[in-house]
Amino acid sequence: MTDERRNIRFERSCCPITCSLDLLGDKWTLLIIRDLFLGKKRYQEFLASPEKIATNILADRLKRIEANGLVIQKIYQQNPTRYEYELTQKGEELRPVLEALIKWGRSYYPGTKVFDEVETLEQEKEN
């Protein structure tokens, strides 16, 4: 166990589902993670997603997932300072979760549409 794991405080309980939902359970976080898997890295790219996340919510979620070790922030422009985001190993390990949600959603919501990029994410798993 790493020091990071030993120092975790449980917000509601020590149930792994509860702990995961405390970080990922809002309606935006997994969509941001999805976009990172699809190659989006910059703030404006996240804002351009079809779900139309508000800027204040996006800023909050990016800070939150960075603080929890799912992404790292890197400067790509100095003046004005602009950042891009990259998944960490911990963030990358959410791929099977997203793939399972795609599969489940397609099974139970047949009218849903999958973006071409999401289709690619699912096909990468099959290859």
Model-predicted regions and their roles:
Residues I32-I33, I65, V71, Y85:
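Hydrophobic packing within well-folded, soluble alpha/beta domains
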Residues T2-L21:
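Short, Lys/Arg-enriched N-terminal segment that forms or immediately precedes the first helix
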Residues P96-N127:
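Amphipathic alpha-helical dimerization/coiled-coil segments
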Residues K40, P50, L62, G91, ...:
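Short amphipathic alpha-helical/adjacent loop interface patches that line ligand
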Residues C15-I57:
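N-terminal helix-turn-helix DNA-binding core of bacterial DNA-binding proteins
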Residues L47-Y76, P80:
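Canonical helix-turn-helix DNA-binding module
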